[in-house]
Each structure stands twice: as structure tokens, then as C-alpha cells.
């Protein structure tokens, strides 16, 4: 089961979130049939949004858009505060690796663009923030967003490891933030430790990735686990929701679907679920609008 662990240093000067998002990204890959680079890019975006959502309260919904002008197109993710996330990538077929090492490439093929967040508090006035993509690797872009938009210096690591068949093996990440009152000495100590910590791919490959991440972040310093919550890929689409969308169309469009297509099929972008509407369904929608 995927999980996010929230923790704080014994001194109260730093906090860290660590995530095991393996099943989340596996589900996304299965639903969208993504190839290697697209899988890693989508997975990192989902993990970033899981971190953002874990930092919100109430019934907020958080949308993350990674908008590049190169191979991937747009990557869209929506998360809630209950641990659910969904998402899709426009180009599912990007599959580019370094010849010598087999490393899956993301950043060089993201292009120029923006990291956009939309936080909907349910009040009708969502908060939108846009920062430029710095590297296109998504983790660094997310850290830059946190520093620039939320004014919180943050260290972030996100990654997705694939097996020999390019299927998701393990996925996860971390976020470390200095809290008000952290001394310059403490900040320097954490910065040094984070710079020297093993690659996140190495930590995720450990027997217990969450423990490996926490140990690398805190080293010999004490810390307290504040909470552990479950995470999952879950889409909230439904036939009723798409029926409402059809009701917003002009009757002439609905009649064309009846006359020309003898029905309609709608595919959810976020989870690829297919919804069928028969001729009778469409006639019923027209009648309901009358």
C-alpha cells in the first residue's frame, strides 16, 4: 500500500515528507499504457502533487500542470487531501534512454514551459501560481515552485524506477523544509547531508524505501513520525458526470450523435474509462432538457 510519512526533527527546525508511491504510478502506467520516459514524467508529477496535497487542509483540490513545449506536451494531475490522485500525459509514447547506461531521460525533452498549481479551497476563488520550468526534471521544478511561490526553501527528490521491461518497479520521493527558527548552523548541516545523500534511485531501491529516505534525511539526528497516511491513484469520474457534460451541448450536436454515430462514447482523460451512451440515452438527455 502506498503511503506518505510526515516527520519533524527533534529540534522542531525541519520537517520531511517521504512517500512510497509505487502502486500509484503502476496504476497510472497501466491505465495510460505509457512508455518509459512518459511513465517517469507522469509519475514524478503525480508524486509532486501527492506532496502538495498532503500539505493542504480541509477538502481542497490541487491541480498541477507541467506545461512543456517539447515531446511530452502537457502533464495534468489532480489530487485531494484524502490521498487520492489522478493524472494523464498528452504524449504517452516518449521512450528515450541514454545509450550507454539505459537511463530514462525526461528533462532534455520537456522543453521550455511552466509549472502551474491551482489550489481550489471550495470557496469559488481558486489560487493559481505559475513558475518557469528550471530543468524539466520536475523535482527541481517543484522545489523552485515551493521556494518562489510558497516562500519556503525546500529540497525535493522524486523518481520512478523501471524494470528491464520498462514496467514500474518502485516510485516515491521526499520533501525537506526548514521551519521558522532553524539556525544557520542547522540549515548548513542539513544542506550538507542532503548534498551527500545517495541518489534517490538508490534509496528507492532499498528494502524499505521510506526508512531509507528518513535515515538519509536525518542521519544521526533524532526525529519524530507525526503521521502515516495512505495514497492511491483514484479517479472520481462517473457516467452521471459525463451525462451532465452532454446536457450542456446544443441539441443539434446531440441529434448529430444520434443520426450519424448512433450513440456516443466518452473516454475519461484521467483514467481511460469508457462510457457508452446509446441513442435512447441521448434522446433522453434531449427530452430532459426540453
Swiss-Prot record:
InterPro entries: Heat_shock_Hsp33, Heat_shock_Hsp33_C, Heat_shock_Hsp33_N
UniProt cross-references to Gene3D superfamilies, sorted A to Z: Hsp33 domain, HSP33 redox switch-like
UniProt subcellular location: Cytoplasm
GO process annotations (BP): protein refolding
GO molecular function: protein folding chaperone; unfolded protein binding
Changes after translation: Under oxidizing conditions two disulfide bonds are formed involving the reactive cysteines. Under reducing conditions zinc is bound to the reactive cysteines and the protein is inactive.
Bridged cysteine pairs (disulfide): 235-237, 268-271
Family: Belongs to the HSP33 family.
PANTHER family (UniProt xref): 33 KDA CHAPERONIN
Entry protein name: 33 kDa chaperonin
Species annotation: Streptococcus uberis (strain ATCC BAA-854 / 0140J)
Gene coding for it: hslO
Amino acid at each position: 500500500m502506498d503511503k506518505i510519512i510526515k516527520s519533524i526533527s527533534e529540534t522542531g527546525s525541519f520537517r520531511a515528507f517521504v512517500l512510497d508511491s509505487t502502486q500509484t504510478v503502476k496504476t497510472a502506467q497501466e491505465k495510460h499504457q505509457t512508455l518509459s520516459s512518459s511513465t517517469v514524467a507522469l509519475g514524478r508529477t503525480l508524486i509532486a502533487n501527492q506532496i502538495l496535497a498532503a500539505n493542504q487542509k480541509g477538502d481542497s483540490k490541487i491541480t498541477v500542470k507541467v506545461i512543456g513545449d517539447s515531446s511530452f506536451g502537457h502533464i495534468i494531475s489532480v489530487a485531494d487531501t484524502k490521498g487520492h490522485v489522478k493524472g494523464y500525459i498528452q504524449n504517452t509514447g516518449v521512450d528515450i534512454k541514454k545509450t550507454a547506461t539505459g537511463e530514462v531521460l525526461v528533462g532534455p525533452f520537456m522543453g521550455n514551459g511552466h509549472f502551474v498549481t491551482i489550489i481550489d479551497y471550495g470557496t469559488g476563488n481558486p489560487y493559481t501560481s505559475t513558475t518557469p520550468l528550471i530543468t524539466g526534471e520536475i523535482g527541481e521544478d517543484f522545489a523552485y515552485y515551493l521556494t518562489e511561490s510558497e516562500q519556503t526553501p525546500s529540497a525535493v527528490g522524486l523518481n520512478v524506477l523501471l524494470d528491464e521491461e520498462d514496467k514500474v518497479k518502485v516510485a516515491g520521493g521526499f520533501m525537506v523544509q526548514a521551519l521558522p527558527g532553524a539556525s544557520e548552523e542547522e540549515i548548513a548541516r542539513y544542506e550538507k547531508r542532503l548534498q551527500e545523500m545517495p541518489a534517490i534511485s538508490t534509496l528507492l531501491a532499498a528494502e524499505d524505501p521510506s526508512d531509507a529516505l528518513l535515515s538519509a534525511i536525518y542521519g544521526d539526528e533524532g526525529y519524530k513520525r507525526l503521521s502515516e497516511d495512505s495514497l492511491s491513484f483514484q479517479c472520481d469520474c462517473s457516467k452521471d458526470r459525463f451525462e451532465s457534460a452532454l446536457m450542456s451541448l446544443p441539441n443539434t450536436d446531440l441529434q448529430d450523435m444520434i443520426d450519424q454515430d448512433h450513440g456516443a462514447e466518452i473516454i475519461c482523460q484521467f483514467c481511460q474509462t469508457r462510457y457508452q451512451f446509446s441513442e435512447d440515452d441521448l434522446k433522453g438527455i434531449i427530452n430532459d432538457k426540453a
